[in-house]
Amino acid sequence: MNIVEGKLSLNGDEKVAIINARFNHIITDRLVEGARDAYLRHGGKDENLDLVLVPGAFEIPMALNRLLACSKYDAVCCLGAVIRGSTPHFDYVSAEVTKGVANVALQFAKPVAFGVLTVDSIEQAIERAGSKAGNKGFEAMVTVIELLSLYSALKN
């Protein structure tokens, strides 16, 4: 049996965008730092990495659609933080950003990673943005890197 899987290395020419929601920026800025660190550690070049800022997580799918449609990027890493409050707003935003990113990703043959935190508290967000639970931005970019390699292997 042949096994096809992606590798965790870049050749340096891959053009990657990070979409980052500014809302809850204390958390999302740390996710961006983690994603950038992963990209550079695995062979990416800083000049091939773009950061696209959107107001909040709800706007991520719209920006993702534009980025993938323009053919400038090989992959996109989506980052944000939706923290539960006392209203149903959390449920609506979490569901729509998740469905939106999935729907857009399926329209294009390019790697997309979902690094949007959906958490019950600011403490959980902090844990996932670089403390106890690692940095989910780093993990999302590692997913992008592996998918870039996998997509390349599947083309050949």
From Swiss-Prot:
GO terms for biological process: riboflavin biosynthetic process. Keywords: Riboflavin biosynthesis, Transferase. Disulfide bonds: none annotated. One of its GO terms (molecular function) is 6,7-dimethyl-8-ribityllumazine synthase activity. Transmembrane segments: none annotated. Gene3D superfamilies: Lumazine/riboflavin synthase. Belongs to the DMRL synthase family. It comes from the Bacteria. The gene is ribH. 5-amino-6-(D-ribitylamino)uracil binds at residues 23, 57-59, 81-83, 114. Pathway: Cofactor biosynthesis; riboflavin biosynthesis; riboflavin from 2-hydroxy-3-oxobutyl phosphate and 5-amino-6-(D-ribitylamino)uracil: step 1/2. NCBIfam families: lumazine-synth. It catalyses: (2S)-2-hydroxy-3-oxobutyl phosphate + 5-amino-6-(D-ribitylamino)uracil = 6,7-dimethyl-8-(1-D-ribityl)lumazine + phosphate + 2 H2O + H(+). It is an enzyme of class 2 (transferase). Its EC number is 2.5.1.78. This is 6,7-dimethyl-8-ribityllumazine synthase. Catalyzes the formation of 6,7-dimethyl-8-ribityllumazine by condensation of 5-amino-6-(D-ribitylamino)uracil with 3,4-dihydroxy-2-butanone 4-phosphate. This is the penultimate step in the biosynthesis of riboflavin. (2S)-2-hydroxy-3-oxobutyl phosphate binds at residues 86-87, 128. CDD domains: Lumazine_synthase-I. GO terms for cellular component: cytosol; riboflavin synthase complex. The active site is at 89 (proton donor). InterPro entries: LS (IPR034964), LS/RS (IPR002180), LS/RS_sf (IPR036467).
